[in-house]
Amino acid sequence: MIEFGDFYQRIAKGNLSHWLDTLPAQLSAWQRESLHGKFKQWFNSVEHLPALTPTRLDLLNGVRAEMDTPLSPGQLEGIEKMLRTMMPWRKGPFSLYGIDIDTEWHSDWKWDRVLPHISPLAGRTILDVGCGSGYHLWRMLGAGAQLAVGIDPMQLFLCQFEAVRKLLGGDQRAHLLPLGIEQLPELAAFDTVFSMGVLYHRRSPLDHLYQLKNQLVSEGELVLETLVIEGDRNQVLVPGDRYAQMRNVYFIPSAEALKCWLEKCGFVDVKIADMCVTSTEEQRRTDWMTSESLAEFLDPNDPGKTIEGYPSPLRAVLVARKP
């Protein structure tokens, strides 16, 4: 089973220590009661991976690990086999000793859009809500974060994260917890909180914004990345059964409406930092994610629309401060 003792030890001293009042019991209950049917299979693959320490590790420009003495073809084949048992790989890419995990999403492109607009991460304690396999946690460390904590209830992502961690030298500055934001107490302990690709999946988006705010220290920064539509402050799309083949999409506001929502929730200095149409180069089917992707979710006769007839995915980055 996955042990969280290193994380408990890491937060025992500092602003997050009060989380220990509830977190160990939550995660123990999760291990007892909530494991996915395939979890043991996925975690068995993690356990069969070698614990490697790279000679060169680049988290600033990507997630890339290399050895001075290359691994043997047999070692590489064994590692790749274990990693492929954890498909699909959606967020990345990762370059691990010559094994290139070409993920569905170019999450590095999103990071390049976000990073120029946010406060420097050096020395910060960070929360990444809905972090997926943790790709951006590693990039946060590359940008100088002291501690990067990701939460995501999808258990495959936890195993993917632990697999990458094992191949990167067991770094304890990044941690992924199998929780949703609604399971966190009001910690008010993070310098920066990221919520990227989550808001449109929430039935109550304003409640989500308050949940994010409650995790921030005073003067802390929220980085919010989500689907938006073109339009003024009064424009919000409420899709029907599906949006781009996704069932659980509830509200897609305009960027201006989202700015108003943030201000209504008490955030200040709200800025629309970036807007970008998602391309089929950024999100696509790969050898590591072989099912349908964005190209199949768009109208084949009009790529400016989803297959359901809605505007095709447009993503915005907003940055705001908790006073």
Curated annotation (Swiss-Prot):
Entry annotated with the keyword Transferase: yes
Pfam families: Methyltransf_9
Encoding gene, per UniProt annotation: cmoB
InterPro entries reported for this sequence: CmoB, Mo5U34_MeTrfas-like, SAM-dependent_MTases_sf
Species, as recorded: Serratia proteamaculans (strain 568)
Annotated catalysed reactions: carboxy-S-adenosyl-L-methionine + 5-hydroxyuridine(34) in tRNA = 5-carboxymethoxyuridine(34) in tRNA + S-adenosyl-L-homocysteine + H(+)
Keyword DNA-binding: no
Similarity field: Belongs to the class I-like SAM-binding methyltransferase superfamily. CmoB family.
Name used for this protein in its record: tRNA U34 carboxymethyltransferase
Binding site for carboxy-S-adenosyl-L-methionine: K91, W105, K110, G130, I181, E182, M196, Y200, R315
Molecular function per GO: methyltransferase activity; transferase activity, transferring alkyl or aryl (other than methyl) groups
Domain of life of the source: Bacteria
Family annotation (Gene3D superfamilies): Vaccinia Virus protein VP39
Function recorded in the entry: Catalyzes carboxymethyl transfer from carboxy-S-adenosyl-L-methionine (Cx-SAM) to 5-hydroxyuridine (ho5U) to form 5-carboxymethoxyuridine (cmo5U) at position 34 in tRNAs.
GO BP annotations, alphabetical order: tRNA wobble uridine modification
E.C. numbers: 2.5.1.-
